Amino acid sequence: MTIVAPLGREADDPLVIAGTALRSRLLIGTAGYPTQAIMAEAVRASGAEVATLSIRRVSLRGHGSDTVSLLSGFRFLPNTAGCETARDAVMTAELAREALGTNWIKVEVIGDRETLYPDVAETIEATRQLVDAGFVVLPYCNDDPVVCSRLADLGAAAVMPMGSLIGSGMGVANPANLELICRRSPVPVIVDAGIGTASDAVIAMELGAAAVLLNTAVAKADDPVRMARAMRHAVEAGRLAFGAGRIPRRARAEPSSPQLGLVGS
């Protein structure tokens, strides 16, 4: 009997973050679903191994939240959503470590409430402090190659540049910058925010991203479970296409069939 590995999830192509190997290159959020039951079904349908959640929805008394209980067996990536200063982000990360027993943290420090753009200076400072405190830091940032390089130099385990505005569904707004970030980064690049549908995830992966993190695209879809499956296959297909290498774009046609031996030639 031949066992065929799922597309893009071959054992020899794991996503490695801080020495942890993950089969899936899709990370998924847990907020905003119609019900907790649908959330749990969609997250499992996505094939993801890492689920993000806000520390504000986790009990610090040891009872856990519905999300934690429903997703037993997943690796959790708590985030610092809602924080506007490095100080608040560090405090939230410490609470997350106490509540969930993990030193993984997704750093979000927002600098503008209308666009939810990250505050670069505060994000860099939070990353510096949290790395020094022994956290595995995955910072959300803008799609700036210099910022991503600085975060990696500080010890971030991965960088998470935005595809476009959080929750916008606009896809990858600046593919040239994202490709440059992916090509230069010494740590995994996880495209975070703005993914609206499966084709957006494919594009992010084809540009060289190591992974995609998304939430709204699945949570707010008409059928979250079906969209989660679509995203799973999209990330896998995009990774395979990146590894295979696309043909160059040309301004004119080039026949794919051999011309030798044609009638009349």
Swiss-Prot record:
Gene3D superfamilies per record = Aldolase class I
Which EC numbers characterise this protein's activity in its record? 2.8.1.10
Give, as in the UniProt entry, the pathway in which the protein acts.
Answer: Cofactor biosynthesis; thiamine diphosphate biosynthesis
Give the main localization category. Answer: cytoplasm
CDD domains with a match to the protein in the record: ThiG (cd04728)
Do you know which SUPFAM superfamilies this protein is assigned to? ThiG-like
Give the reaction(s) catalysed: [ThiS sulfur-carrier protein]-C-terminal-Gly-aminoethanethioate + 2-iminoacetate + 1-deoxy-D-xylulose 5-phosphate = [ThiS sulfur-carrier protein]-C-terminal Gly-Gly + 2-[(2R,5Z)-2-carboxy-4-methylthiazol-5(2H)-ylidene]ethyl phosphate + 2 H2O + H(+)
Species lineage, top-down? Bacteria, Pseudomonadati, Pseudomonadota, Alphaproteobacteria, Hyphomicrobiales
Give the UniProt family note: Belongs to the ThiG family.
PANTHER family with a match to the protein in the record: THIAZOLE SYNTHASE
List of catalytic residues: 106
GO cellular component labels: cytoplasm
- Role of this protein: Catalyzes the rearrangement of 1-deoxy-D-xylulose 5-phosphate (DXP) to produce the thiazole phosphate moiety of thiamine. Sulfur is provided by the thiocarboxylate moiety of the carrier protein ThiS. In vitro, sulfur can be provided by H(2)S.
**Binding positions (1-deoxy-D-xylulose 5-phosphate):** 167, 193-194, 215-216
Indicate the enzyme's highest-level EC class: transferase
- Compartments, as annotated in UniProt: Cytoplasm
Write the gene name. thiG
Superkingdom, natural source: Bacteria
Task: Please cite one Gene Ontology biological process associated with this protein.
Answer: thiamine diphosphate biosynthetic process
InterPro entries found in the cross-reference section: Aldolase_TIM, Thiazole_synthase_ThiG, ThiG
Task: Tell me how this protein assembles.
Answer: Homotetramer. Forms heterodimers with either ThiH or ThiS.
| Stated name of the protein | Thiazole synthase
